A protein has these predicted regions:
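Bacterial N-terminal signal peptides that target proteins for export
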Residues: 2-9
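Propeptide-to-catalytic entry region of secreted or membrane-anchored zinc metalloproteases
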Residues: 24-138
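Short, solvent-exposed loop/turn elements at domain surfaces
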Residues: 63-70, 139-142, 163-164, 225-229
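Active-site-proximal segment of zinc-dependent metalloprotease catalytic domains
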Residues: 121-195
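The catalytic-center signature of Zn2+-dependent metalloproteases
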Residues: 167-245, 255
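Conserved small/polar residues in nucleotide/adenosyl-binding loops
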Residues: 258-264
């Protein structure tokens, strides 16, 4: 799966970083050959207000695939709780014809997302992250959502509907709530995507994910394995280790090891 390959490359780079002296600051760039960066590459742009004082979350959705209001309301709350944006966090919804209602690859998400983008992720004093809600499924149909670069996520509602078990517990709406927060958590760099946590909370078998099933960053959240939660109480919160990581990144006590170049 391409997403795991990309995360694997990112983690390999992080393993090599001790050879570099000190931490990279908010302007530090590594020569990773993706001009739109990697998930987590714009985490400080969200956590800090020195450059970007406001944030826009651009929701581009296929007709009939508008996200649940509970999902976007919850995402706004989670971002406001961790991101320093004194001029506010706004959501912009745009119905979009992606001309693809079948199978999506990570490159499709990047390329068609780029075509649909209203503005650059880093424009003036506003940081913009983009979330696609397309028709169709990811090329690995067990994947419910994917973060493909520093500012872009796709959520696959068709696969979410398929993941809802016959008892509707958890419901498709509850699954979407969790998957959306989970994927944006990857844009925030969780878990260990662009830093090394002082806490041992990364799942060794699922890099970039939490080993705590009460965290929204738990590894099963972004895949059809989520149906194994037989009640309707899916995690939608970052746990204390996740929040401590974000706080440490924000105050500089945790080194940020990679930040993105300016995306296209």
């Amino acid at each position: 799966m391409e997403r795991l390959r990309r995360i694997g490359i990112g983690l390999l780079v992080l393993l090599l970083l001790p050879a570099l002296s000190g931490c990279l600051g908010s302007d530090g760039i590594l020569g990773i050959p993706e001009s739109n960066g990697i998930p987590g590459g714009l985490t400080l742009a969200c956590l800090d207000s020195s450059k970007y004082t406001s944030m826009t979350v651009e929701i581009d959705y296929e007709a009939g695939y508008l996200p649940e209001s509970t999902s976007t309301d919850m995402l706004k709350q989670r971002l406001e709780s961790v991101c320093d944006k004194p001029d506010g966090i706004n959501f912009q919804f745009t119905e979009t014809d992606f001309s693809n209602d079948e199978t999506w690859s990570a490159n499709d998400v990047r390329d068609l997302g780029d075509e649909a983008k209203a503005v650059s992720p880093q424009s003036g004093s506003t940081l913009t992250w983009q979330i696609l809600f397309p028709a169709g499924t990811y090329d690995d149909t067990s994947v419910l959502g994917v973060a493909v670069d520093a500012s872009t996520v796709a959520i696959f509602k068709d696969s979410i509907d398929d993941a809802e078990n016959i008892f509707r517990r958890p419901s498709a709406e509850k699954i979407e709530n969790s998957v959306l927060i989970h994927e944006v958590g990857h844009l925030l760099g969780l878990v260990n995507l662009v830093y090394t946590s002082p806490a041992d909370h990364e799942d060794s078998s699922h890099p970039g994910h939490s080993n705590n099933e009460d965290s929204v960053m738990y590894w099963a959240i972004e895949s059809s394995s989520i149906a194994n939660f037989f009640d309707n109480d899916l995690p939608t919160e970052f746990d204390s280790d996740d929040l401590n990581d974000l706080s440490g990144l924000a105050d500089g006590s945790i080194c940020l090891l990679y930040t993105s170049p300016s995306p296209r």
